[in-house]
């Protein structure tokens, strides 16, 4: 995205000029880096560029491609440990490579959903079933919390689905006492809090620096725009409101109501929230019709990515608690496509979870003798055909 690329260039210029993370410089004044976006990438990418004297393009490639490769290696390792069958391992590699290729083609901050899912879930599934690795499992839970928190600050809610998955698995699937389960959940949340405290400290330092060094600077509270995205999401289908899936569509609407409102400010979000509520209240048919159109696209992605894993989960169940954990996580990541637009970018976290679900379901089915059952079924059918002829 060109606007994000420009913002990263300004973030690097600000870091080179001041030495303070998350301070941008546009050639005229200092300003907050990534004000209307999630700050993680505006911290890590300029840091890489500054530390190793690289261009912003090189740093973007190192960050996104490097993280994709690391998460791919971790996920393959996790599934190789989880499954003993080489058939299951082969299927996992094929599925993960396909997902990695799609993620690479989409690119940008949407990749962070894939990083979190691939880096954590396969290894977690292995560790939760191995009582001999309690110490490693405990450390993994804490580090997972830090990773999820970092992902959240790099792309809003990029780790929330994984957090949901881990908590449900810890509380309902793990075969330990309730006190120990609650302790692990608390440890997971402590890890998340470590990331939150760190990034909030960076923001606080940034704001203090700008107040002292940039004349007339007013502290801001940056957050990922929600109602802006929901409003333009109504532009998925042709409509009577003139809404299109374009930032300018929301911007023009706000300006028609309040010409002096600053783009993506709190007042801006409040105005769009009111417009969304009006549409929901007075045109429910349009809202429901649009929602089901988006759900239909998401369902198609589910069928493609989970594919025969859906059938495998029916005939060879993994246990209700694991199913619940997966489906609540998948459902959460589907919300991005349903609330905004069901593009492959917005649904990349949904696609990644569906793929991991499919791989896991097939692997568990093979462990329960699915291949032997299929072979026996085909043999019986062959005998029946011979008898009838």
Predicted segments with their positions:
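Membrane-proximal stem/loop segments at transmembrane-domain junctions that anchor or position
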Residues: 1-27, 205-294
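Loop-to-helix entry region of an early transmembrane alpha helix in multi-pass inner-membrane enzymes
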Residues: 30-73
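Aromatic- and kink-enriched transmembrane "portal" helix at the membrane-lumen/periplasm boundary
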Residues: 57-61, 68, 93-116, 148-149, ...
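Transmembrane-helix motifs of polytopic, lipid-linked glycan transferases
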Residues: 62-86, 119-123, 306-309
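Hydrophobic, aromatic-rich transmembrane alpha-helices
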Residues: 70-79, 296-320, 370-378
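Transmembrane-helix signature of polytopic, membrane-embedded enzymes
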Residues: 76-101, 134-135, 320-324
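Membrane-interface transmembrane helices that cradle and orient dolichyl/undecaprenyl
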Residues: 118-140
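Membrane-interface alpha helices of multi-pass inner-membrane proteins
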Residues: 140-155, 167, 187-196
């Amino acid at each position: 995205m060109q606007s994000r690329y420009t913002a990263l260039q300004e973030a690097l210029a600000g870091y080179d000029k001041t030495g303070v993370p998350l301070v941008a410089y546009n050639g005229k004044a200092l300003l907050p880096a990534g004000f209307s976006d999630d700050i993680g990438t505006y911290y890590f990418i300029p840091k890489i560029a500054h530390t190793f004297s690289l261009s912003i393009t090189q740093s973007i490639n190192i960050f996104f491609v490097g993280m994709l490769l690391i998460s791919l290696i971790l996920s393959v390792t996790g599934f190789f440990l989880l499954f003993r069958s080489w058939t299951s391992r082969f299927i996992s590699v094929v599925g993960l490579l396909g997902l990695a290729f799609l993620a690479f083609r989409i690119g940008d901050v949407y990749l962070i959903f894939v990083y979190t899912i691939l880096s954590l879930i396969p290894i977690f599934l292995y560790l939760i079933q191995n009582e001999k690795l309690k110490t490693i499992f405990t450390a993994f839970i804490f580090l997972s919390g830090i990773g999820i928190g970092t992902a959240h600050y790099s792309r809003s809610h990029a780790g929330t689905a994984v957090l949901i998955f881990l908590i449900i698995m810890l509380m309902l699937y793990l075969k330990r006492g309730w006190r120990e389960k609650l302790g692990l959940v608390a440890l997971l949340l402590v890890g998340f809090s470590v990331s939150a405290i760190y990034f909030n400290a960076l923001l606080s330092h940034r704001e203090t620096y700008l107040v002292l060094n940039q004349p007339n600077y007013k502290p801001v509270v940056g957050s990922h725009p929600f109602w802006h995205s929901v409003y333009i999401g109504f532009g998925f289908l042709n409509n009577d409101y003139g809404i299109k899936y374009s930032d300018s569509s929301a911007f023009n609407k706000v300006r028609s109501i309040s010409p002096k409102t600053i783009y993506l400010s709190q007042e801006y979000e409040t105005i769009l929230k009111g417009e969304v509520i009006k549409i929901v209240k007075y045109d429910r048919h349009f809202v429901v019709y649009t929602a089901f159109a988006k759900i239909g696209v998401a369902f198609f992605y589910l069928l493609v990515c989970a594919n025969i894993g859906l059938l495998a989960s029916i005939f060879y169940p993994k246990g209700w608690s694991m199913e619940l954990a997966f489906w609540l996580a998948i459902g959460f990541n589907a919300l991005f496509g349903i609330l905004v637009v069901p593009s492959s970018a917005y649904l990349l976290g949904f696609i990644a979870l569906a793929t991991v679900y499919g791989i896991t379901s097939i692997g568990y089915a093979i462990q329960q003798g699915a291949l032997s059952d299929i072979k026996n079924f085909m043999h019986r059918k062959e005998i029946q055909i011979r008898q009838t002829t």
